[in-house]
């Protein structure tokens, strides 16, 4: 485990919603592949939630291709670590949200394919960028008005800090 994001605000929750995810760490020339939300001004690593009965690696490949247009080279995939997140749901105070976010260092083919975005992703203007890690960290820590919990932005900033400390970037 890289680290945990535990709000400790879930006393009284009566049920758990679990949705694990897989995220790609693709590094080129000291920059990382990130999906940028033009609408809300934040960055996230390409990737997303695991479907029922889907492996983390399969979700990594599928979600990265859909969100960014980058096709991961399967032989390059290496586990980096995971971030454990647990907190009360933002929409249901009786629900505890639990998520393990699995990060994989990998390479992608040079060609960028068309994105296959979900409705909300297209509405947010998801765009693939290769970004300077410090720019991402600064942007994600700047206060913003979004429908999302700021823990998501902090998660990505902290993973980038770990990658910098470990000399990947």
Residue ranges and their predicted role:
Residues 16-18, 93-100, 120-125:
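A generic structural micro-feature
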Residues 50, 83, 108, 133-136:
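Hydrophobic pocket-lining residues within nucleotide cofactor-binding pockets
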Residues 85-115, 129:
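Active-site-adjacent beta-strand/loop module that shapes the phosphate/pyrophosphate-binding cleft
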Residues 27-67, 71:
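Conserved Nudix-box catalytic region and its N-terminal flanking loop in Nudix hydrolases
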Residues 1-23:
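Acidic, metal-coordinating catalytic segment for phosphate/diphosphate chemistry
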Residues 42, 112-169:
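Nudix hydrolase/Nudix homology domain
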Residues 71-82:
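A short coil-to-beta-strand element that immediately follows conserved catalytic motifs
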Residues 16, 42-43, 85-88:
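Short, solvent-exposed loop/turn segments at secondary-structure junctions
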């Amino acid at each position: 485990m890289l680290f945990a994001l535990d709000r400790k605000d879930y006393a009284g929750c009566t049920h758990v919603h679990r949705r694990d995810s897989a995220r790609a760490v693709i590094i080129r020339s000291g920059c990382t592949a990130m999906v940028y939300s033009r609408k809300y001004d934040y960055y996230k690593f390409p990737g997303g939630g695991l479907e029922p009965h889907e492996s983390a690696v399969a979700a990594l490949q599928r979600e990265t291709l859909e969100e960014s247009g980058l096709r991961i080279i399967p032989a390059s995939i290496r586990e980096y670590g995971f971030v454990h997140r647990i907190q009360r749901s933002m929409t249901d105070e009786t629900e505890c949200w639990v998520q393990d976010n699995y990060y994989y260092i990998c390479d992608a083919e040079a060609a960028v394919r068309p994105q296959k975005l979900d409705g909300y992703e297209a509405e947010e203007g998801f765009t693939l960028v290769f970004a300077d890690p410090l720019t991402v960290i600064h942007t994600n820590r700047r206060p913003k008005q979004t429908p999302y919990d700021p823990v998501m932005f902090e998660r990505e900033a902290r993973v980038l800090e770990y990658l910098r400390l470990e000399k990947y970037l």
